[in-house]
């Protein structure tokens, strides 16, 4: 697809609905079932995923957890055709090095990830086990911030739908173990 087709594809992707093409892994189901609080962004796909996982709408939606957008307003020759994942890579790479036309800058998204990690930390202090149903790239950024705050969890994120990573925080003062699941 050309860059123009990719721009349209991204718009349609954002407006689309989730399709359960792959079964939900048991670890993800267990993470949701053990959570005392489930949080998601307000983006359509995340809300649909949370509703599918919970079979209800009993979760907190917060725009702070929205995915980091990929810039698509960059020049590419009209004859150049790439697969969507290649255009995503090009857009994401340009974004990381400073190109952010029409989207939040990398620096702004990193700050938002820091804020999101702080909110998740506070939710975990209150509720113990929590789950975030979110978006792969932004979840990875939140994971980086959680690890910087002393949480333990894998720096490797699942690229497949319905993947789950568990972060654990051992509170030294009273021996509490808090868990956050990023899905």
Kindly give the residue locations of the regions a language model identified.
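Glycine-rich phosphate-binding loop signature in dinucleotide/nucleotide-binding domains
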Residues: 31-33, 120-128
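Short amphipathic alpha-helical segments
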Residues: 50-52, 143-146
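Short alpha-helix plus adjacent loop in nuclease-associated cores
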Residues: 66-81
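Domain-level recognition of soluble alpha/beta enzyme cores
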Residues: 4-7, 147-175
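Active-site-proximal alpha-helix that buttresses catalytic centers in soluble enzyme cores
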Residues: 1-64, 82-94, 101-114, 168-170
């Amino acid at each position: 697809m050309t860059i123009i087709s990719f721009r349209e594809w991204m718009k349609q992707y954002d407006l689309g609905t989730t399709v359960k093409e792959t079964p939900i892994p048991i670890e993800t189901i267990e993470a949701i079932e053990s959570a005392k609080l489930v949080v998601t962004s307000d983006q359509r796909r995340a809300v649909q995923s949370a509703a599918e996982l919970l079979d209800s709408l009993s979760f907190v939606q917060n725009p702070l957890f929205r995915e980091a957008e990929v810039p698509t307003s960059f020049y590419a020759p009209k004859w150049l055709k790439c697969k969507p994942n290649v255009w995503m890579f090009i857009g994401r790479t340009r974004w990381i090095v400073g190109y952010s036309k029409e989207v939040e800058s990398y620096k702004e998204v990193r700050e938002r990830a820091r804020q999101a990690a702080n909110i998740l930390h506070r939710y975990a202090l209150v509720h113990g086990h929590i789950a975030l149903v979110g978006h792969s790239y932004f979840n990875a950024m939140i994971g980086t911030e959680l690890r910087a705050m002393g949480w333990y969890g894998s720096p490797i994120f699942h690229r497949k739908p319905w993947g789950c990573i568990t972060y654990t925080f051992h509170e030294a003062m009273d021996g509490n173990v808090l868990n956050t699941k990023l899905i």
